[in-house]
Amino acid sequence: MKALEINNLSFGYKDSEKLIVDDLSFDINKNEFVTIIAPSGTGKSTLFRLILGLLKPQKGNINILKDGNKNIIGYMPQKDSLMPWRNILDNTAVGLELNGYSKKEARKVAATYFEGFGLKGTEKYYPHELSGGMRQRASFLRAIVNNPSIILLDEPFSSLDALTRRKMQSWLLDLCQRQSNTVFMITHDIEEALLLSDRILICTELPYRNLKSIDVNIERPRNYETTLSSEFIELKRDILNVLDSLEENKGGI
């Protein structure tokens, strides 16, 4: 079953003659973790804004698996974007409130996730009182508490220091291995993509037209020892070769 289908999608901003996306088609299966890799500044976040409905394509369509009568998308941006005037529990419950839950009901549902997300005890804290990693956990919980059809992660750990980023990657890896979610992630970190993903899409030309799909056939559960395996290193080499070829063909991006 397809969680996301993109068919012949084209888009360009009005103040530019160039298209960012040109007749692009791909899909993501339900409960699949897919990552797209491309250099920074090439329009990956624009693709997410199209999926979220914040931008309207000039051509093509986007189909998202519906949950009953709802078409719910979870979104986690690069920065946590938590509301500073709300405590952590109220921040994580806001999506439920927007979908018709009373504040009391929303808090009750959100609170059931706190222990599994390593957030137990932070319910009454405010965002400025937590570390960057803990704020990102709360942001991810806010993205999935509605049980969305698909979760979009826009370079979720890029703003964190290297040590915290590694801890958060391990946490997300463990979380995704314990529960089934459909995830579409943007990153330029090849190791992060290989560690977390079932499949990786690589931009092979600009504007976005053809995406090379690479299956990450590395056994789960995975951990950081996985990054030292011959399979992992070989896949990383393959991806680097594709990206190097793109740079050479386009004279750099």
Predicted regions located by residue number:
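The feature captures the beta-strand-to-loop junction immediately N-terminal to the Walker
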Residues: I37-P39
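Helix-to-loop junction immediately C-terminal to a conserved catalytic motif
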Residues: L52
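Conserved ABC transporter NBD signature motif
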Residues: G60-N71
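Conserved ABC ATPase "signature" region
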Residues: K104-T122, D174
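Conserved signature/switch motifs of ABC ATPase nucleotide-binding domains
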Residues: Y125-H128, N146
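Hydrophobic anchor residue at the start of the ABC signature
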Residues: F140
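Catalytic Walker B motif of ABC-type/P-loop ATPase nucleotide-binding domains
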Residues: I151-D154
